[in-house]
Swiss-Prot record:
Principal localisation: mitochondrion
GO biological process: calcium import into the mitochondrion; mitochondrial cytochrome c oxidase assembly
Family: Belongs to the CCDC90 family.
GO CC, one annotated term: mitochondrion
TM spans (from-to): 193-215
Organism: Schizosaccharomyces pombe (strain 972 / ATCC 24843) (Fission yeast)
PANTHER family linked: PROTEIN FMP32, MITOCHONDRIAL
UniProt-listed InterPro entries: CCDC90-like (IPR024461)
Name recorded for this polypeptide: Protein fmp32, mitochondrial
Length: 216
């Protein structure tokens, strides 16, 4: 069964009430568009306005309960999505703590990587110097032995001077070839080492730049 309510007269009588509710609603909006303060529904005034409009008490109370329930449900749903200033501050503080922790971890990782890189580079240079010293000693020993043998052969076999001289030249050529190969390998090794170091430094710089952009 539907209620027959004179729409025009009720609207003009309810207009101050609805206008007051609208003002309260606008004033109570927060930063996120939710109510900061709940203004209760004026049920007594609503019933009186209905009665003045010619509606009996039972129908007035029924309409009052329906509108009050709708108003309360709407306020509860809006309140569920509201966020307080304290919650926003807590989230912002937690984000700052997380960023500080992340920055500390990145700095610690960077320091560890730099220390490890420095240690590896020093170890590589130490290995290269040790190889150079060992090869130089072996080369000197080989050259000394070869020259000693050549001198003995020259004393014992003066007629084989030309042959021994040829052997000496061949040995010198082999030594030069080995030295040239060693220099080539050493240059290649240095180039690879510098490329590896540059790649690590570039990667660390890119990681640090990404972190700075994330912080900013």
């Amino acid at each position: 069964m539907y209620l027959k309510i004179p729409c025009n007269s009720i609207y003009h009588q309810f207009q101050p009430l609805f206008r007051a509710r609208t003002v309260h609603k606008v004033r109570s909006l927060g930063l996120n568009g939710f109510y900061r303060k709940y203004h209760g529904f004026n049920s007594l005034r609503f019933v009186r306005v209905l009665q003045e409009a010619g509606i009996d008490d039972k129908k007035s109370e029924t309409l009052m309960r329906l509108i009050s329930n709708v108003y309360s449900d709407m306020h509860e749903k809006i309140s569920d999505f509201s966020v307080t200033k304290e919650q926003q501050d807590r989230v912002m503080y937690q984000q700052k703590v997380d960023f500080a922790h992340l920055r500390s971890e990145l700095q610690s990782i960077e320091r560890q990587e730099m220390v490890a890189l420095h240690s590896q580079v020093e170890q590589l240079f130490s290995d290269v110097e040790r190889l150079k010293t060992s090869f130089r000693d072996q080369l000197n020993n080989s050259t000394s032995e070869a020259r000693l043998q050549l001198n003995i052969d020259r004393l014992n076999h003066y007629d084989e001077t030309a042959s021994q001289d040829l052997k000496l030249r061949e040995l010198s050529a082999e030594i030069d070839t080995e030295m040239s190969n060693f220099r080539t390998q050493l240059a290649s090794f240095k180039t690879q080492t510098l490329q590896w170091v540059f790649g690590i430094v570039t990667g660390s710089g890119a990681l640090l730049l990404a972190y700075v952009r994330l912080i900013i």
